[in-house]
């Protein structure tokens, strides 16, 4: 929403068309509050987030200039979640995946769970990518799908690490003298 660059702090709200960049050792986790879809940006990444309201639904998209992104997209139930890069466009239904995008060499889309459709923007060729597969889309127009190897996920280890959850528990007494336990979980 702001016109000038600023450092994001945990819990910072983001708006339609906000641009986000991470530095060399940067890491950011974003969450769409309507459906709890999580997007994780690793170091040296640049993207623009978009969320277009259509009635009571939000059509989401990420415009990735370059970088490494991991996401867990919840089933969209009549909404759309699109990812675009300089080389490709992907339509996501509800899935967990990792993307590595470089404008000069192209994109890799690695599916951990679910299904996406990837289209090479140069040729318009499309293919479906399933769990355990990686699609490679290049600026010369090629689009290939192969079985995922450990190399395809190299560098994404930090994206899969969930922060440890802390818990606070305390008891309160309501107006009728009943004891209730309150549990607060936080990272």
Sequence positions of predicted segments:
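Extended, compositionally simple hydrophobic/Ser/Thr-rich segments
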Residues: 71-73, 81-82, 90, 99
């Amino acid at each position: 929403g702001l016109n000038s660059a600023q450092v994001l702090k945990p819990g910072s709200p983001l708006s339609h068309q906000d641009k986000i960049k991470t530095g060399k050792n940067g890491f950011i986790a974003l969450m769409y509050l309507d459906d709890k879809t999580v997007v994780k940006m690793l170091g040296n990444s640049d993207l623009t987030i978009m969320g277009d309201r259509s009635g009571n639904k939000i059509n989401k998209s990420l415009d990735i200039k370059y970088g490494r992104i991991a996401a867990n997209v919840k089933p969209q139930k009549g909404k759309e979640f699109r990812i675009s890069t300089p080389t490709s466009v992907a339509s996501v239904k509800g899935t967990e995946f990792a993307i590595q995008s470089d404008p000069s060499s192209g994109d890799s889309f690695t599916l951990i769970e679910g299904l996406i459709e990837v289209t090479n923007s140069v040729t318009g060729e499309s293919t479906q990518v399933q769990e355990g597969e990686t699609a490679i889309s290049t600026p010369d127009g090629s689009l290939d799908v192969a079985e995922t190897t450990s190399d395809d996920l190299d560098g994404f280890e930090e994206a899969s690490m969930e922060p440890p959850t802390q818990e606070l528990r305390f008891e309160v007494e309501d107006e009728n003298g009943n004891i209730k336990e309150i549990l607060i979980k936080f990272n």
